[in-house]
Curated annotation (Swiss-Prot):
Main location: membrane
Pfam families hit by this protein: Spore_permease (PF03845)
Protein name: Spore germination protein KB
Similarity comment: family membership: Belongs to the amino acid-polyamine-organocation (APC) superfamily. Spore germination protein (SGP) (TC 2.A.3.9) family.
Compartments where located: Cell membrane
Membrane-crossing segments per the record: 11-31, 37-57, 78-98, 105-125, 143-163, 185-205, 219-239, 269-289, 306-326, 338-358
InterPro entries given in the database record: Spore_GerAB (IPR004761)
Keyword field contains Transmembrane: yes
Annotated membrane topology: Multi-pass membrane protein
Lineage: superkingdom: Bacteria
GO cellular component, one term: plasma membrane
UniProt keyword Transport present: yes
Length: 373
């Protein structure tokens, strides 16, 4: 797994699929009401800054794993502690994403099936993919990205043709001022989905060419932000803001409204395929980061074997994380962003970025002085 190589194009596709993932299931920026789409765009702008930090650290240490460059910046003991905390973070978020998609399948397809069965089936596929390595995941992302794009385009056309879009549901814009939007940005959308790209610090070392990481990564994030904002705006324009916020899965509720010429309806099950693809990749990448982080920290010679215990742990956590879906959503919206995402996505990476840039300048200065001698 650690010797695998992926292209910058594959990274581009993986970022888009990862970003869309579970963010299309719910309503990002829900605290902003009918202005949620604005909160998504502003959150994306901050997400671009966060990605700049993440790739900036990598560019300072292009040939090192996160554990190795934290050793250089923090010392062995602190590096070990923070590496371990990030492993727990990746595993925890993987469990939350797995729970999201398990609940979706229970709601729309498998009403009487225990959630542990549904989650277990999803996790088995992710474990298999992670054991095959990041190269296989990247190639699968390239292949399935086209299917997601096609399904999304068909869905947009059908919604327009069905005549269910009412732009008036998006008005008045900023009726309550900018404050609710900014509150939503700094408590929701800057973290999910955009700050979640912190995971890619575990994937950057696998790139075969690092010169276009910043450009391609930011383009991928901008595209993702536009797609998520458009999806939120369509949900609100079709369902109205009240129903959008009450719906557990507003995109699928929007798809259910499609009815063309009395024969084309109930397409939500069909479009669940696109969502499941996104969910599979998101869970798989979080599992991959957990496995790679654990193998690096504990010097495991056969990292792929860790996919089994890590996957089982994430599966169990996804069931025990909340007693019901309402509690799960409440924690995800009100607790996780400020108490979990904030330190792992912003505070600690910002500190590492400052230290990395400072150390890089010191190294360059030292080399310059030696050259003069």
């Amino acid at each position: 797994m650690e010797k695998a190589r992926i292209s910058i194009r594959q990274l581009f596709v993986m970022i888009i699929i990862f970003e869309l993932g579970s963010s299309l299931l719910i309503t990002p920026g829900s605290m902003a009401g009918r202005d949620a789409w604005i909160a998504v765009l502003l959150g994306c702008a901050i997400g671009l800054f966060l990605f700049y930090l993440y790739q900036g650290i990598y560019q300072c240490y292009p040939n090192s794993s996160p554990k190795e460059y934290m050793d250089d910046m923090l010392g062995t003991k602190l590096s070990w502690l923070f590496s371990f905390l990030y492993i727990l973070y990746f595993a925890y978020i993987a469990a939350r994403v797995l729970r999201d998609f398990g609940e979706m399948l229970l709601t729309f397809a498998y009403h009487d099936t225990p959630i542990i069965i549904v989650n277990a089936l999803l996790m088995v596929v992710s474990i298999y993919a992670v054991r095959k390595g990041i190269e296989v995941l990247a190639r699968a992302a390239e292949l399935l990205f086209g299917a997601m794009y096609l399904l999304g385009a068909i869905g947009l056309v059908l919604i327009i043709v069905s005549g269910t879009i009412d732009p008036h549901n998006l008005k008045p814009v900023l009726a309550n001022g900018i404050s609710p939007v900014l509150h939503s940005v700094f408590t929701q959308t800057m973290y999910v989905p955009f700050g979640e790209v912190v995971l890619f610090v575990m994937i950057f070392p696998n790139l075969n060419d690092r010169k276009d990481v910043k450009k391609m990564g930011m383009i991928a994030m901008a595209i993702s932000g536009l797609i998520v904002a458009l999806t939120v705006a369509i949900n609100i324009s079709v369902l109205d803001v009240d129903l959008t916020l009450r719906s557990q899965f507003p995109l699928l509720s929007t798809i259910q409204t499609i009815k063309v010429e009395e024969f084309l309806d109930r397409l939500d099950v069909f479009f669940m395929l696109a969502l499941i693809i996104g969910g599979f990749f998101k869970v798989s990448l979080y599992l991959y980061a957990t496995v790679v982080g654990t193998s690096t920290l504990f010097k495991e010679k056969n990292p792929s074997q860790l996919a089994y215990p890590m996957g089982l742990g994430i599966l169990i956590l996804s069931i025990t994380i909340a007693t019901n879906f309402s509690e799960h959503l409440n924690e995800g919206l009100n607790v996780v962003p400020l108490y979990i995402h904030l330190p792992f996505q912003l505070l600690f990476p910002l500190f590492l970025f400052i230290v990395a840039v400072w150390k890089k300048k010191r190294r360059e200065k030292s080399k310059g002085e030696e050259a003069k001698k």
